[in-house]
């Protein structure tokens, strides 16, 4: 099995990249793909860049050039579920855009024309992530992750997202685009992110302070999932 792993930022991929054995680097457009083996599993690790376009472009190149069997999106997210704190984990059951609106034509909020209302994560990958959560004794929430080309900071945008998507667990800037591309390629995916900030009016302050914690926690989860895959 080959596993595609996607992180947007240098801080979100560096721990994994540095542990890849026989690492080779492929530079495509604005992204970088690092291939090799990690914990006995063949991996292709993409540093996509921030935002939906960069994520979609990078995911397309990753799937086309490396042909992974499954994709794990790692990194940080802003927590909206009431039980989430910095360093906790959010696992996607589905992903949606929070900044897409073609409701005038009968679509649901967040639904792109011609697409499903949400992109569903793979049930087997969700179950694997949840087993790793139990083994690592981490706090986690499984639920909806919403993506958009904005860092959510302030009461008004936060209220809009919660009003439109009352079941939302976390927000970030790439997962829905990654899920969209994986859906088109019929590639199973899951999003496993660590909380870097609890979305509120001071999110930008806590994000800068706690990004390192989130990167360490999300890396811990990805490595646990790879070890579990290697033992199957």
From Swiss-Prot:
Q: Does the keyword Hydrolase apply?
A: yes
Active site residues of this protein = 12 (proton acceptor), 197 (proton donor)
Which CDD domains does the entry link to? Answer: MTAN
The record, for InterPro entries, names:
MTA_SAH_Nsdase (IPR010049), Nucleoside_phosphorylase_d (IPR000845), Nucleoside_phosphorylase_sf (IPR035994)
Enzyme class, one word? hydrolase
The catalytic activity, as recorded, is:
S-adenosyl-L-homocysteine + H2O = S-(5-deoxy-D-ribos-5-yl)-L-homocysteine + adenine; S-methyl-5'-thioadenosine + H2O = 5-(methylsulfanyl)-D-ribose + adenine; 5'-deoxyadenosine + H2O = 5-deoxy-D-ribose + adenine
CC terms in the record's Gene Ontology section: cytosol
Please list the GO terms describing molecular function.
adenosylhomocysteine nucleosidase activity; methylthioadenosine nucleosidase activity
Q: Which Pfam families match?
A: PNP_UDP_1
Tell me which family the UniProt entry assigns to this protein: Belongs to the PNP/UDP phosphorylase family. MtnN subfamily.
Q: Which PANTHER family match?
A: 5'-METHYLTHIOADENOSINE/S-ADENOSYLHOMOCYSTEINE NUCLEOSIDASE, 5'-METHYLTHIOADENOSINE_S-ADENOSYLHOMOCYSTEINE NUCLEOSIDASE
Q: What is the protein name given in its UniProt record? A: 5'-methylthioadenosine/S-adenosylhomocysteine nucleosidase
State the species of origin. Edwardsiella ictaluri (strain 93-146)
Gene designation: mtnN
